[in-house]
Amino acid sequence: MKKLVLFCSIFILLMSFRTFNDKTKVNFSSGFTSMTIDTLFKDKISIRAILIDKNKVWYGADNSRFGYYDLDKKEKFEEHIYRDTLKLEFRSIAQTSKNVFLLSVANPALLYSVDKKDKKVKLVYKEINPKVFYDSMQFWNDKEGIAIGDPTEDTFSIIVTRDGGETWTKILSDKLPTNAVGEAAFAASNTNIVIKGNDTWLVSGGKKARVFYSADKAKTWKVVETPIVQGKAMTGIFTADFYDSKHGFIAGGDYEIPSRKVDNKAFTKDGGKTWELIGQNMGFGYASCVQYVPGGNGKEIICVGSEGIQYSQNGGENWTQLSTDTKFFTVRFINRNTAIAAGHNKVVRLNFK
């Protein structure tokens, strides 16, 4: 969503926070017993899109940058993708076994493939429209992938590939559910799309906060309402994750009132058919990214957002503060005990015990 770009810089300036230093240890009662934070690198950079590729953490960033950090070699590789005089911002990233894909926000929308071996960059999709703004991208398998963007007409902009990312096709509006006026998506952490097998969930915000579901890899869709706060441009679902095909969690809130802790978290036990609020007045306010902890039986969740890093071990009802650093936008797990978080000016490793 375009307005999120403007609010991000303002939000960082206005928020007051205490940063946890490297190797800070946080103890909490059960579940995990401690967490330490290792800074992998710092730079003048904004990162909202990361993925784990074996020993590498790939990222898309602002100022036309992408790269990776090699966890084994402790080295960073970074490159720019120059397109005329444009300063691209990559907020969507996805991968196949051979390539990493980067998708820019705003107009024009530019989607690039990057060969993992030789780092060769190729433009595979371009869309020009004053309203174009892509928010998230994922792959079902090595051949099929999907990206979601704000409506340019009266439905989400959805592009798919069936040939490993070589070509992308935009789904016609008459094949998609109609969006409400003012309903779009947020490019907060590349978590607007969640895939489990063939099941696909898309989440929306703004005037409506809904979940769009496809059981057949974007061929047909159903839509359900959620109780998440909605009605204003910067309210709704900013992030989602599913532990399996049945258990999911959505979060977000009101970006302009980041301390609001009600109607901002919900869970499902039936694959997204119904959603129930949880954790009212508990834990965080605005959420940028939520992720289930691997091996946590759908009960353990990590959130990064307006109040730092928080952890729940009971499905989102109660939350423990792990860090008050509000500069993280996105997080991904490597395994149960290790995650990578990125955001404003840094990428770190979170170590849980």
Segments from the language model and where they lie:
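Bacterial Sec-dependent N-terminal signal peptides
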Residues: 1-32
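Asp-box/BNR beta-propeller loop motif
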Residues: 27-40, 63-83, 108-128, 158-177, ...
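Repeated scaffold domains used in trafficking and secretory/extracellular systems
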Residues: 46-49, 88-94, 131-138, 234-239, ...
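Blade-level signature of beta-propeller repeat domains, shared across WD40, Kelch, NHL, RCC1
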Residues: 333-353
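Beta-strand-rich domains and repeat architectures in extracellular enzymes and scaffolds
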Residues: 39-64
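Entry beta-strands of beta-propeller and related beta-repeat scaffolds
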Residues: 56-58, 99-101, 143-147, 199-201, ...
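Short glycine-/Asp-/Thr-/Trp-enriched loop segments that recur within the blades
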Residues: 41-42, 84-88, 129-134, 177-187, ...
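Recurrent small/Gly-Pro-centered beta-turn motifs in extracellular repeat architectures
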Residues: 61, 103-105, 147-150, 197, ...
